[in-house]
């Protein structure tokens, strides 16, 4: 296959095009999801221990795997702002992901125009920009996976294993590379690199050891995750079963976030690459570009199958837009490769195919842009309530706050032990009120959710009605996407009276 060299000015241009919106977003856009504020808290805690020299290996243990938090904590030693350190690190990984998509596409297609189109598709994607500016693991994890794929295409199996291992210390789903990369190498070269295999085994062994050192149970993290999963289904029984509206909603979210054209091209490329007459990687006379496309297809469908299986077995009860980001990143080189193959096989329809793909990509980007704006509106409403709590709650007091809006709780910066949720309190009216009094609950964050006890017992609170028990202190809402939050001061004196 022909290999192209890049003009000297190309890389700086690509870095600027991908970097400007992501670095700016890190400073000016809010985090796209409430989990980001938990990451920020963990980054701050870890950074403080690193600065004071009290950091221990067991401090890596937590609900999530620790690599992203650790990298951000090291950066925060110099930046000294945990909020922006996590966002800045994610933005850098987002820039790197864009550059890797360009490099992988160029390697697959030997066509710079196709590579630049693929780069533009990810560099200007609203969802990718939004999450590159958020302190979360989705984009850093995608970077490590893309880097691993790049070295697989180069047959650099040890380096591919190194980046796959880094992905495996970022998110647990990348542990499947223990099987995926050796399988690809065996099918390609009829051998397996023992060094690469040993490197791939490091993430699970490392995490089991950390869990054992921190808790005495090498599976403690998975026990904790299963407990959270069971609690989530208990609090939201609708998530434990499929309904047509929920399946349609989740399917639409996954399809749009992955990109319709990308998803279709992945299935087309899989059919091209694995049809019967090209059944083995090593078949004599098989064109190199047909061999090479198989690795990206295997990567794509490994993660796609894992996500779909988790959803169908209720291990992943709902689909969020960010779940499609990795598939989108892996699928762009496949899309460009498929476009070129279809154009070669049917030149008369090449223009029609290109226009159709562009139309689908523009449609997807438009939907994602609208969704990102709505998500930012929701975050602004949540931030207003969180800021009020942060300013008015005395951290030295022994009172509690009731909140079924977890994002508000995390955003407030108040220790999570100060918050109570519906899962902590009795569900009957008398028991609920007695518990408020017993725990000295000072504030109640009211959201009209089906699983929220206050929403069921006191429906009048959704309109800001003042009662003997609850006095409204602020209201924050967004019209698109809908978010409506009332903050009430609890009158414990009235609660105490029969």
Regions found by a protein language model. Name each.
Residues 1-2, 153-157, 176-204, 208-209, ...:
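Perimembrane helix-loop-helix junctions
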Residues 11-16, 162, 178-179, 197-205, ...:
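Signature aromatic-anchored transmembrane alpha helix within multi-pass, membrane-resident enzymes
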Residues 16, 182, 252-297, 301-304:
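Hydrophobic, aromatic-rich transmembrane alpha-helices
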Residues 20-21, 25-28, 191-269, 300-307:
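Membrane-lumen/periplasm interface segments of specific transmembrane helices
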Residues 25-37, 48-73, 77-78, 84-87:
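Membrane-proximal lumenal/periplasmic loop motifs of glycosylation machinery
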Residues 33, 127-138:
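Short acidic/glycine- and proline-prone juxtamembrane loop motifs at membrane-interface regions
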Residues 132, 138, 167, 176, ...:
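Hydrophobic/aromatic-rich transmembrane helices and adjacent perimembrane loops
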Residues 356-409, 419-424, 430, 436-437, ...:
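Membrane-embedded, lumen/periplasm-facing catalytic core of multi-pass transferases
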